[in-house]
Amino acid sequence: MMEGVIMKRKVLSVLLCAGLAVFMLAGCGSDSSNANKKAESTGSDLEYVKDKGTLVVGVTDFEPMDYKDDNGEWVGFDADMAKAFAESIGVKAEFVEIDWDNKELELDGKSIDCVWNGMTLIDEVKSSMECTDAYMNNAQVVVVPADKADKYQDEESVKDLTFAVEAGSAGEDQVERIGAQYTAVSSQADALMEVASGNSDAAAIDALMAAAMIGEGTGYADLTYTISLNNEEYGVGFRKGSDLAAALNDYFKKSMEDGSMKKCAETYKVQAALIEK
């Protein structure tokens, strides 16, 4: 009789523990989905980001816009502005290094909240994302070994070169436009390495990156850039329909008025490219 009572108590204890575990798991799942549910009910990406407490920023290694310092922290003009904007809406910025060719998938899957990485406002980007107003001017430039630069001073002269370009980038678009052969790599930094190693004749990269990373006093002292293939502008991309784009436009305007945006640009020597708001 006593053994039966003990057995019943053991069974009851197991059931209670199991029920408690299920309840706790359900609670955790509820916490992680609260931000999503509120965003769905309000239709606000801004509220979604505020509720979860983080703005997840998709980036690549792209000096002077986004790159890691000696401590492994993301810095650069875009990175610093992202941190400041996140603070202004009461959250923290987190940085995730992405495959540039998959940036739209990362956004739509909510593994990131924005693409803030010197992104050129081409038609494809503007049709698939909610983009801010342009905040910086740029161009795609041709990078070649410095001792060969004199040979490549116009588009016609570079058409027969083999290029390295970042997959899905504006540089890739421009190389396709002129009809040159190219190899797509994972980042603009990798494109520079391809030229430095002799695997490619040239690279098409952002002018701002070229100014920061090649030439005398850099790790690519033997490289230089010659011609511009286009003129373009940078913007930040959010999920289609996101109200964060308008919030960031407002922040850009205020930070231009109070001088903080220009001060940040001066830190990374890109102030001449800023678009006045």
Q: Predicted regions span which residues?
A:
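Short helix-initiation/N-cap motifs at beta->coil->alpha
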Residues: F95-E106, D150, A167-A170, T183-S197, ...
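Flexible hinge/capping segments at coil-to-helix
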Residues: V144-T162
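Bacterial lipoprotein signal-peptidase II cleavage site
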Residues: L25-K38
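Alpha-to-beta junction loops
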Residues: L55-V56, G90-K92, G109-N117, L161, ...
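Extended ligand-binding regions for polar small-molecule ligands
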Residues: G29-D31, A79-S88, S169, E233-A272
